[in-house]
A protein has these predicted regions:
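N-terminal metal-binding scaffold of metallo-dependent hydrolase/deaminase domains
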Residues: 1-44
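Active-site metal-binding motif and surrounding structural segment of the metallo-beta-lactamase
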Residues: 39-56
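Metal-associated gating/positioning segment near the N- to mid-region
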Residues: 51-123
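Short catalytic-loop micro-motif centered on adjacent basic/acidic residues
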Residues: 94, 129-132, 269-274
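Histidine/acidic residue-rich metal-binding segments in metalloenzymes
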Residues: 141-157, 161-344, 349
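His/Asp/Glu-enriched, well-ordered alpha-helical/loop segment
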Residues: 236-266, 316, 343-344, 350-428
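C-terminal cap of metal-dependent C-N hydrolases
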Residues: 358-363, 369, 417-483
């Protein structure tokens, strides 16, 4: 008789390495999966959970969130991680930077980042890690210490921040970014960030493949000009106006610039974030052909796959890059289905009503950018993906295996012996209507309000401990900071 802490019986196990699910039980000991096989002996198990034939997905590795951007960081860690559990997310990788929002301060990461860790310790219901954005020359010099001391292996550039605001046009981005006097956040800075990340890869060759740079690809000059054109014409309103003010070719141009800079600096690990349009992904594909020595990874969000400028529920759907017309949504699905897209994320950024909307409330240019959505990530992908012929295994790759490999999480992303027992049980035949009131998030609205989904996460396990039961978060926070690469 083998002793287990948990045996999950009668589930259909989904893994990235096979298209369809297979019937099996999952045995867990000390937070790790020790066996996946049919008919496991449960006599010595401390806990047995009957899966009822549900799909067992690896816990989602949501590689793009924004804890603390609009709410206190400790609050988001506690509350928004509950929404994560609802969506089957067990590892949340959240972007962080100095400047306005977040901790609302500048300075060195040597002082800033320990405060970030302190504010989130013992609060999250899921495991978490941080990507950091080098906003100054001093931050670039800190990259090796961030890798060595804090296990931060992924960094970010916001390509439009130097000349265009987070929510629209801005004449004073230096104050917003809190960059040192005399420094510019521009293409030259992006080049030097790339050189700094590449130097870190060379300094730590054993983990070089896990050290990468992610880029938000939009072009400030194009967006500023088109925002003025849209406002002066006055013909478009709402999300259609916002999409037109940040046109897809702005993404494509930024992708092209970022790609050439990667070639110039010799940095091969580049992640192109939340590509929202056919033109953006087309540019990414073209750059991959032009620079085959660069290991590009391409990301899209579940929001851009589920909603468009017409179906999203009002200006609450404002986000960067914008939600697009339906033809771009269809194009993104083409790229998901043909394997061009590497992973799908939520870009979860809880923005409560009092912060989100301006006056008048329906003026999209007065609204803030971003919304929550982690709770709909896996349900949305299973619902819409399977409807379009996407295999279950490919969904597991897009939501867990691929981001875990890129971002230095070797024990995450697969339901197999030796991996963390991060498990999401999904009922693929549960039809339900999205209502913001049913979410654990502090956000009172959702752009997906009224959407009908046909799959639901019923139970979520973090390292073998159940954190979601019958759709409700249970227990105290047990999430841990992921010092990457984990297990090193």
């Amino acid at each position: 008789m083998t002793e287990y802490d948990l045996v999950l019986t009668d589930v259909r196990v989904v893994t990235d390495d096979r298209d369809e699910a297979r019937a099996a039980d999952i045995a867990v000991r000390d937070g790790k999966i020790v066996e996946v096989a049919p008919g496991l002996d449960t006599a010595g198990a401390r806990d047995v959970v009957e899966g009822g034939g549900k799909l067992a997905f690896p816990g989602v590795v949501d590689a793009h969130q924004h804890w603390g951007i609009y709410n206190p960081l400790d609050q988001d860690a506690s509350v928004e991680s509950r929404a994560c559990a609802q969506g089957g997310v067990t590892s949340a990788l959240t972007y962080m930077r100095t400047g306005q929002y977040y901790l609302n301060k500048g300075g060195d990461y040597a002082d800033f980042f320990p405060e970030v860790l302190e504010r989130t310790a013992d609060r999250a219901h899921v495991d978490y890690a941080y990507h950091l954005a080098p906003m100054s020359k001093g931050h670039i010099a800190e990259i090796p210490d961030l890798v060595r001391e804090h296990g931060v292996t992924s960094f970010k550039v916001f390509m439009f921040y130097g000349g265009h605001g987070l929510h629209g046009r801005s004449a004073d981005q230096s104050s917003f970014l809190m960059t040192p006097e005399g420094e510019r956040y521009d293409y030259a800075h992006f080049e030097f960030v790339m050189r700094g990340v590449q130097e870190a890869r060379e300094r730590f060759p054993d983990i070089a493949d896990q050290i990468s740079l992610s880029l938000h690809c939009e072009t400030a000059e194009i967006m500023s000009a088109y925002t003025q054109l849209v406002e002066e014409a006055g013909e478009l309103t709402g999300l259609a106006a916002y999409s037109a003010s940040r046109p897809p070719h702005s993404e494509g141009l930024a992708v092209s610039i970022a790609s050439y800079l990667a070639h110039e600096t010799g940095l091969p690990t580049i992640n192109l974030l939340h590509l929202s349009s056919r033109k953006a992904v087309d540019a990414a594909v073209r750059m991959g052909r032009a620079f085959p020595h660069i290991d590009f990874r391409r990301e899209v969000t579940v929001g851009h796959l589920l909603a468009d400028i017409t179906t999203a529920h009002g200006p609450g759907g404002k986000v960067n890059p914008p939600l697009r017309p339906r033809e771009d949504v269809e194009a993104l699905w083409e790229y998901v289905l043909d394997g061009t897209v590497d992973w799908v994320v939520s870009d979860h950024a809880c923005c409560r009503e009092e912060a989100k909307f301006g006056e008048p409330k329906d003026d999209v240019f007065l609204a803030k950018s971003g919304f929550g959505g982690a709770e709909y990530l896996l349900p949305g992908m299973v619902t819409e993906g399977t409807r379009r012929g996407l295999s279950l295994g490919r969904i597991a790759a897009l939501t867990a295996w691929n981001p875990a490999r890129r971002y230095g999480l070797p024990t995450k992303g697969r339901l197999a012996a030796g991996f963390d027992a991060d498990i999401a049980l999904v009922d693929p035949d549960h039809t339900w209507t999205v209502r913001a009131a049913d979410s654990e998030s502090a956000q009172e609205y959702t752009p997906f309000e009224g959407f009908e989904l046909t799959a639901r996460v019923t139970d979520t396990f973090l390292r073998g401990t159940r954190v979601l039961t019958d759709g409700k978060v249970v227990g105290e926070p047990t999430g841990r900071y992921l010092h990457r690469p984990t297990g090193r």
